[in-house]
Amino acid sequence: DSYVEPFTDAGANLITVHQETCPHLHRTVQHIKSAGCQTGVAINPATSVDLLYPILPDVDLVLVMSVNPGFGGQSFIESSYEKIYKLDAIREQLNLNYLIEVDGGVTSNNATQLIRKGADVLVAGSSVFKSGDIESAIGDLTSKMNAGRADMG
């Protein structure tokens, strides 16, 4: 909570907090909203989506960490697909509008499947910046994301 004002004073329009670091997640989300920012909540790979259920109507974004936070270049954790699918199903069932973002191990090899499962935003670090050809890597990733969207009709 003590970081909200410094971020908003710096011009932030979206603040994402980790569920695991907030003992009073609802209070933190409401604090962010009252400061005029959109709110996001992130979950680590071992955290169940079920823990977010009470807060989902209040957030603008859910960030699924698909690697353990801390350093780049880790492999995508396969159980993240089920989390994305479940978050998308809840969003549909409750007619909510939060975005689903995925960060960690995102590559052109899994981008299509991530979009098909319900992801809206993909964060690709190492797969782009360590590719040797950033422009080509971004183009390939974008193409795979668009293929996933086309598959969804």
Residue spans of the language-model regions?
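A short hydrophobic/small-residue beta-strand
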Residues: 14, 39, 121-122, 128
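Conserved, mostly hydrophobic/aromatic
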Residues: 7, 62, 87, 103, ...
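Acidic, divalent-metal-coordinating active-site segment for phosphoryl/phosphodiester hydrolysis
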Residues: 105-117
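As written
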Residues: 10-12, 118-119
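Expand to "…catalyze enediolate/carbanion chemistry for C-C bond making/breaking, isomerization
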Residues: 23, 27, 93, 107, ...
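Short Gly/Pro-enriched loop/turn and capping motifs at secondary-structure junctions
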Residues: 68-70, 105-108, 128-129
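C-terminal helical cap(s) of enzyme catalytic domains, especially alpha/beta-barrels
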Residues: 32, 115, 129-153
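Conserved anion-binding
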Residues: 2-6, 12-99
